[in-house]
Structures are given as C-alpha cells and as structure tokens.
Amino acid sequence: MKIKKLTSYLLGRNYEAQAKLFLQKQGLSFIAANVKVHGGEIDLIMKDKQTWVFIEVRFRKSGQYGDALATITRSKRKKLLHAAAVWLFQRGECFETSSCRFDICAITGQQFEWLQNAFNQNEFTR
C-alpha cells in the first residue's frame, strides 16, 4: 500500500473510532465496524435500543470545496442501503421486519455533525 493511501486509511479509521466513542456516549451500543458485504462496506453498525443503526463516517480537512456531508451522493446512499440489506438478510432479518435507520457522522475540519435518520430505504422505492 502506498504511503498516501495508508495515511488516508489510518486517518479514516481514526475518525471512525472517534465517531464510535461519540455515539456510545449518546447511548448507542456498538455492534461492528468496517463490515464488508457484497457490494459495499458499512463503517459502523450500532443499536439504539431496538433499532439497527447503520453509520457512514465522512471527513474533510476543510469545507473549501464542500463539507463532508456533501460527499454522500445518491449512489453512495444506494450502496449503503444495499450493504445493510445484505447484512440484515445474513441474520434472517430485513427492512420490513426490523427497525433500522441510516445516520451520518460528518467531520469537516474541527466541526462534528451527527445526522440521525439522514436517509432511508424509501428513497429508492416507487
């Protein structure tokens, strides 16, 4: 792995760890991190009481070219939804029978933003 990629990887893991600690302080229970399934990766999976919470963590050094939240495109949301559906299916669950939400932890410079229920599976159904 090249140094720049390694540095980006470690930086990403650092911010994911910070997000995990923050969310635990808010009362969420940690389940898993960096879950890879066919078609995607979920940064953090946590539980908020009986609700599965799938979390995407994004970081930008500055907001000069848009904040971290702006990097979560429709395509990225669709991949996260698919990855969560696969993860649930592997456990005998699905969106229709489980309480789920998709949160975003966006870090731009020193600013930390937690968006609960930032999007959901209904965005892609007609």
From Swiss-Prot:
The record's annotation in InterPro entries points to: Restrct_endonuc-II-like (IPR011335), tRNA_endonuc-like_dom_sf (IPR011856), UPF0102_YraN-like (IPR003509)
Which is an annotated GO molecular function term of this record?
nucleic acid binding
Disulfide linkages recorded for this protein, renumbered to the chain, are none
Family stated for the protein in its record:
Belongs to the UPF0102 family.
Indicate what this protein is called per its UniProt record. Answer: UPF0102 protein plu4003
Organism the protein comes from:
Photorhabdus laumondii subsp. laumondii (strain DSM 15139 / CIP 105565 / TT01)
